Curated annotation (Swiss-Prot):
Subunit structure of this chain's protein: Homodimer, forms a heterotetramer with a Cas2 homodimer.
Protein name: CRISPR-associated endonuclease Cas1
Superkingdom to which the source organism belongs: Bacteria
Family the UniProt entry places it in: Belongs to the CRISPR-associated endonuclease Cas1 family.
Amino acid sequence: MFCIGGVNMKRSFFLYSNGTLKRKDNTITFINEKDEKRDIPIEMVDDFYVMSEMNFNTKFINYISQFGIPIHFFNYYTFYTGSFYPREMNISGQLLVKQVEHYTNEQKRVEIAREFIEGASFNIYRNLRYYNGRGKDLKLYMDQIEELRKHLKEVNNVEELMGYEGNIRKIYYEAWNIIVNQEIDFEKRVKNPPDNMINSLISFVNTLFYTKVLGEIYKTQLNPTVSYLHQPSTRRFSLSLDISEVFKPLIVDRLIFSLLNKNQITEKSFVKDFEYLRLKEDVSKLIVQEFEDRLKQIITHKDLNRKISYQYLVRLECYKLIKHLLGEKKYKSFQMWW
């Protein structure tokens, strides 16, 4: 019925069974097709992930909106279809003006976009260095990426930055064939639709992470539709894509490498449906649990000198960006230090 992520008081609830979500007094009730019921205390819920057919009414929506709880929807093929987000509770007109100002000013936009790429490419390099030190010969890929990174400071437009980012990722993805112990024949990233096991796996875990980043943005005063590296769009929360780039090597890629190298995911984990590769339900649940466990992993922050989770690192990144936008402190993207 449920797959519950996380170990803290507030949790993500992944709903794999068809059914109904409804408000019952001051709690949430899930009723499946067999009329089995489970009550979910509202204070336990961070967000809902609907991986099935689900019914709910405006009474339920109004109730979860009071608590700022989003719902993320996935289709039969485990493709993300969208999110319901309550009305923003943390609003700052001053910050919104500054966000837009830093987008419309090309120099200010490039400065932020470049820093996203600096962080992402550094963390990619650290991943390669990590596996190079564990018996994988990745020196050639490391040298190529290091050479490309040297030119980032010279770039003065977003399109060229995206070009460098694409070239760095192309080299990085070529190295996956060495990092992963299975025969994966991974040549390039294909998204719409993903055409093989690796692309399907990347798409699913990326999407899980995008929604988590969006949730962290929502807890701050940032507007998730105003972005700097990715072009803002009428149909996506593009700032979550920007911030995700910095953390994907640590959270998404490391998780995928672990799942594949432990043979928790193989070609048998997928079902072919027409031109799509669909994750089996039990495999999807496994990935969700491993993903949530990774987000809850604790490290000691080098500057704060206190223990925080990987997920909270994302919130800190939002706060750092806010300080930059308000002119308090120049934004420096997250870079792995361990």
